[in-house]
Amino acid sequence: MGYFYLTAETWTLLVAFVTLLLIYAYWPYGTFKRLGISGPKPVPFFGTMLHYRRGFFTFDEECKKKYGKVWGIYDGRQPVLCVTDPEIIKAVLVKECLSFFTNRRNFHLNGPLYDALSVAEDDQWKRIRSVLSPSFTSGRLKEMFEIMKNHSANLIRSMKKKADKDEPLDLKEFFGSYSMDVVTSTAFSVDIDSLNNPSDPFVTNIKKMLKFDFLNPLFLAVAFFPFLGPILEKFELSFFPKSVTDFFYASLEKIKSNREASQQKSRVDFLQLMIDSQKNSGAQQDKSLTDHEILSQSMIFIFAGYETSSSSLTFLAYNLATNPEVMKKLQEEIDATFPNKAPVHYQPLMEMEYLDCVINESLRLFPIAARLERVAKAAVEINGIVIPKDMVVMIPTWPLHRDPEIWPEPEAFKPERFSKKNKDNIDPYIYMPFGSGPRNCIGMRFALVLIKLAVVEILQQYSFSVCKETEVPFEMDIQGLLAPKRPIQLKLVPRS
């Protein structure tokens, strides 16, 4: 019994510790009860995160059905107000966007990406966004278009090798390499040709970066004990593998140094615009980027450009293969716009109405941003709901895009929903594949041009077809980004 003997002081300390631990564990979970907002019951430390084991999009959909347009969840100890009411969404993303809300929450585990546009807040965010915005104007996209066409031609040639052998294509592999080649070429004037070099370190490293798990021990540690975030940040711990961020920052630093040392007139690309902001601002530091900010924006552009475009193209190809009547109608528009497989030009491509409908419908089913987040900088009341300071407001686009009260037959692929006749009836705060408001996806138009060019040039020559390797319907991955659990495989059938 001696092993179990404790002094009165020790027992007092033990009881005090357990009491404090229980208070700490349960303390935040009365937030939504006090606000009069319903939601799933949290468990100590985890909050409602254990539901993510079935997929966060499934969880969001179930909550919307059960609790209506507003509910509360807990990511660990962090209260998260979930909103699908269009009026509240408009206030959060647009009306009060800059005055009462800042960017998504910061877990302090960003590594060297601490000053990327997706993490920056308030004045820093405004400064970076203002420098980057000119990269994505229609004029810039037209300049980039011929460069994109070089890589779309490489994509067709690579796909042809599989088509000639009647072999299925792993779509993400092809579209990922195409996206990477377009991004690095248009952003940095560097041709890595990952379509022909799939083991290129740019591609292998970006794949490592995309492996994110909501139940990652580092993520859970910060979710359970938020005060650890800034401490772990001091030790330079990050969600992203250090070897990956080191590789990209070293590569981008070399590209930047070579650009600055070169006397030749370089292409006016994403990198050059950022470098020019330093040269042209003089003493006006509020109109330029630091050296590190330039590298961070370059890194996030590679990451976002690769993942969003390649995933959207993959889902689009699947939707066309499983809806051949839609694909046939799209091919008819392509043939009418570019007769006899004529070269694709920017302006007519941008004016293709049915192509827009098809892409919009695919993005409805598989939005690039399945969740949008903002954090309250100060307490604010919107539509009778009090949002306290530091509250995370989350807008789940997945259930919004699949709400049967808004979209009849929500699981069906019906591009006509976005026809001229119907699109004016679509609430812009219901359909938000790229987000909305001042903080929407800055590369939205770039991604759409990249997607349109690839799908039109492929469908000029081929049709997508399901095969025995195609999983219909496919199973969604439950971790991290919106993606299929297993690679989507299709065949290309030459058009007669």
From Swiss-Prot:
SUPFAM superfamilies: Cytochrome P450
UniProt keywords, alphabetically: Endoplasmic reticulum, Heme, Iron, Membrane, Metal-binding, Microsome, Monooxygenase, Oxidoreductase
Example of a GO MF term: steroid hydroxylase activity
Membrane topology qualifier: Peripheral membrane protein
Short name of one Pfam family: p450
Superkingdom assignment: Eukaryota
A cellular component annotation (GO) from this entry: endoplasmic reticulum membrane
Catalytic activity of the protein: an organic molecule + reduced [NADPH--hemoprotein reductase] + O2 = an alcohol + oxidized [NADPH--hemoprotein reductase] + H2O + H(+)
Residue ranges crossing the lipid bilayer per the database entry: none
Tissue and organ expression note: Highly expressed in liver and intestine. Moderate expression in gill and spleen. Low expression in kidney, brain and heart.
Positions with a binding annotation for heme: 441
Location(s), subcellular: Endoplasmic reticulum membrane; Microsome membrane
Enzyme class, spelled out: oxidoreductase
UniProt cofactor(s): heme
Its EC number(s): 1.14.14.1
Its biological purpose: Putative steroid 6-beta-hydroxylase.
Family membership: Belongs to the cytochrome P450 family.
Name the record gives this protein: Cytochrome P450 3A56
Provenance organism: Fundulus heteroclitus (Killifish)
